[in-house]
Structure formats: C-alpha cells, structure tokens
Amino acid sequence: MSLALAVDGGNAKTDLALVAEDGSALALVRGPGSSPHEHGLEGALDRIEALLEQALAESGAGDACEIAIAELLLAGVDFPGEVATAKVRAEARGWARRVEVGNDTFAVLRAGTDRGWGIAVVCGAGINCLGLAPDGRQARFPALGPITGDWGGGHDVGLAAVIAAARSEDGRGPHTTLERSVPAHFGLRTPLELAEAVHTGAIDQRRVVELAPLVLAEAPADAVAAGIVARLASEIVALVRVALDRLGPVDEPVEVVLGGGLLQARDPGLLAAIDAGLSELALSLATIVVDLPPVVGAALLALDALGAPATAYARLRSELGAAAAQRNLEPLEVHHG
C-alpha cells in the first residue's frame, strides 16, 4: 500500500503525519519549527527529517518502507523561487518518490473543504490568504508583514493592545481596560513597567502574541479592544475581497475557510464582524471555520496526489483528527515571512 508524508511546518511548531492510501493514520508527531526563514532551508529539512525518523519508528513501518508522496507545506515559502528551491532540496533527501512543496495556507484550505477550491484566510501569529479558482488559478499574497502592507494576526493584535494600554496610561489615548489587563498578563502593574521590562529584555517583545485572546475577551465591554477586533475583521474581509477580484466571477457559492488560532477560537464578536463585512461584498459566500489542524489538510492533499479512493478521505479526517485531538494539537500559527 502506498504511503504519504504530510508536513505542516511553521516558525514555532512542525506537525508531521504518515498516512496510508486508504486514509489510515500511521503516525503523528510534533516537533520544533521548520521555517526556512528561521533555520535556513537545510536546517529546516534536517528538523523535518528527524521528525520523519520518529514517525517511521512510531508507525512500525521501518526505514525500508517506500513513501509515494511527500506534501510539505511550510510557512514563509511564498515566492515561486523559494518553492522551486525547497522542492529540489527536499527531493535530494530521498524521502519519497514525489515531493510537493507549498505554503501552509494550502493546508488550511484543503482541511476546510473537499471542493478543491475556495478562499482561505489564516490568522495565527500573522495573517495570510489564498484564493484558488475551480480551474486552478491562484490569488496569493506575499504576507511578509508590514513591508507588504499586512496587519493582523496575534502579534499585531497583541501589539495594538500594548500601544492602547500605554496611551491610556499617559493620556494620549482613550481610557481602556487594557491599561490594567495587559501588564497584569505579565505579572506587572502598569504599562510603563511592561515597557521597561521589554526595553531591558526581561520580557521578550514577541510575547505580545499572547495578548490576542485577552483583546477578544475584553472587546464586548471595552470600546478600544472592540476597535482592535473591528480592524482585524476589516483586514480579513479586505483579503477576501481582493482574492475574489483576482479570481474573477464564479458561478457558484464560494467557500471562505477561516483557520489559525485566532479564528478557530470562534470568538462570536470577531466572526460576526467578519460575516457582516463579507455580506457587503454582494456575493454568495459560505464561511467555514476549520476545526482540524493544518497537517490534516496536508495529508488530504497527499491523498489527492495518490488518487486515493473516496472512502479514504473520511477515514483520514476521522483518524488523524482524533490523533491530533488526543495529542492536543491546536491549529498551528501562521507567521509573517
């Protein structure tokens, strides 16, 4: 029976699954991040290879088994040149007879729909979007962060909360409950104490991503937090609008798959704001919040490449989804670059 390797790699974490053509999940492992931008391409592949060895041992398949397809979906692999280089280097590892490389937004889209096309917006630590037409045409975004005009995701939401808290404290901005809750998250009393801790290195500024759930929680009762959430919803709607414009007219309803930690938290206020914005686009859109980690989408794409039987897809969703839940694999974060 043909085997498939599925990888969803981000800056913070990597999930790797080994599955059979009939959809059975043979192994699921998690390890450190494997973004080429963070670790170099060979360093990223080294990390994936270590996880593959672990998965082979866990599955009992052994080193002698033959993997037909490796589906590697990696954060930060956005440009055609990056994809081509990563594909050549991965092929040289000899993991599988065939290797496919792409950005991790493809994993989220495939995990959320069996149609093979639609729009995916991923909102984890950063934000990204993919549009895929029925005929295969793509609408992509570089998603390199501020340098490509991006705003959104846990980092930007958290940083906005820190800024709002500081301006509330010194009077330059409106009062907000974030003035107390933001420093309290780090065990501090005031935004100024937090600023000093970040300035001196006592607190890593990257930890602002931890504040995103706090902003969502306070938005119903705090106008400033609500404004941050409204901005996030507006950015998501803008990505969908542009993707739709690039893809052109479609004769049937378009599924918009929402993934990543911030969106999969299913915050009612955020989802309502997104739905309201999408309704103004005057198109037939169906919103889907994906419940599965992106590695499941990578595995489904691998089954597509194998020409797996229809029964394999339900089995894979069930078995790999259950394995992910058992190991408490939350949706992976999507990072800029």
Residue ranges and their predicted role:
Residues 1-63, 67, 111-117, 163-337:
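ATP-binding/phosphotransfer module of carbohydrate and carboxylate kinases, centering on a glycine-rich
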Residues 73-77, 123, 217, 227:
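N-terminal loops that bind phosphate or other acidic moieties
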Residues 77-175, 180, 324-337:
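Phosphate-binding/catalytic loop of phosphoryl-transfer enzymes
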Residues 75, 139, 145-146, 192, ...:
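Flexible, active-site-adjacent loop/turn segments at secondary-structure boundaries
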